Amino acid sequence: VSSIAILGFAAPTLIAVYRAGVDKHIVIVLIGLSIFALGIEATSILTGFPYSRFVYGNMIGGRVGGLVPWTVPFAWVPLVIGATARLATLRSHPLFSLMCGFYLMAIDLLLDPAAVKLGFWTYEYGSAYYDVPLQNFGGWVMTGTLATVVWTFAFRKTAHGDAIATLFLTCAFWSSVCLFKGLYIPAVIGALLAVDALRWAEAHKKQNRAVFSPVN
């Protein structure tokens, strides 16, 4: 796994954005979410909030300010977009953003144990769940919810089924890693998420053309 792999997983979402027509509005939102991703990671590294205190290794790209790898926005923002795509039928629900936050937390139940096992990052204090602090998962709910609020506020209509491919690739790959490393609970979670993403994509083939309608 390297920065190239992270960009590869992000590619379907980036292609979806490109197909939609890259305008100033989309660029501003994506840059804003990327800065948020870098900033919240740096805050957690320095203060322990919201993910718990941790430190990155050198395996996934050079670190911005010596703290956060530049690849983080390419890993995280596409997952946010994918979550809003997967749960798009619930968009009118008042708790839509929170549901996306919990969906992203489910993905992290897969990602974090594998990343810790491979030495991508190390927490100061772990837990019984594969040395990942439970606080970290609450942090994912919080940041995922906030990011979804921004995304859905910026775009009145978002149909971007192509972004589901990022979810599938990410979950399928990391569930395989977890299985190989003996992390069986995360492996099962990842397999379920991957199958769900694949089934969703099959059921919504006609909606796979990306459309972004900004709020005026």
Write out the residue ranges for each language-model feature.
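Aromatic-rich, lipid-facing transmembrane alpha helices and their immediate juxtamembrane interface loops
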Residues: 1-216
